[in-house]
């Protein structure tokens, strides 16, 4: 089985009771809301990654104001030629950010198609990725160790069809 590690950095930007989110097509094509952010390029510092990604996806420049925590997941996905499974681990670094400049715009030709401020109270009703909830809990609770709870058994990866 192939192994793959993806490291990414995301920002929680909250102002006036709203959070900055981006919209991305989900695995089945259904749009879902995500945090602005994304994968690190080789040799890039995660601090620089989150600033670059927020600008690419929203048009805003941010100041990183804190490190909220880290989220990790692991899953096995089928696929490839010849057919073989991939044991995929994702490591997501979650920062707090404050918008310092730029103008809200949509990413053209990227992984997202819309950026918007969403009311914090409306987030539970949005179609969103799990990371949005994890990041909001980190932002609200501020655990001193930067972790909400032990990740879902990283020693036993979940299959892609498991909830």
Report residues per predicted region.
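Short, well-ordered beta-strand micro-motif
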Residues: 13, 94-98, 116-119
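Nudix hydrolase/Nudix homology domain
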Residues: 28, 104-163
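A short coil-to-beta-strand element that immediately follows conserved catalytic motifs
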Residues: 61-70
